[in-house]
Amino acid sequence: GNMDQTVWNTINGRIFETRYGKGIGFETINDTVIKLAQKMGYVLVVRKDPRKGYVRIKTLPKSDKVDADLTLVYEQLKKMDPEATWFLHVGKKMLLNGTAKNPKMIPTKLKLDDIIKVLEKV
């Protein structure tokens, strides 16, 4: 819809390539970008909250075309920033670094670019 387009246009997404397909990264407090990007066919979406520093990485659900697994990304990010709280969802399709619901979680010091570099390599 139009609203989607407006939201999309105000956000500067960074597009990158992964072995699973195209990814896109955002620095925004707007969580709807993840759903929008997935609708547009991005296999991997990263959102970093510029205020709190938290990161969310999501992949598309398993399909004939793609079956992404964030385990190696999780291990690599844990090595790079062991202080931060990293949580790999049981389905291996979602990697969270802190949520608003858990105030004890420590946001990562890594920049969005650092995280994108890992996603490009792994």
Residue locations for each model-derived region?
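Gly/His-enriched, cation/cofactor- and phosphate-binding structural elements
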Residues: N2-V122
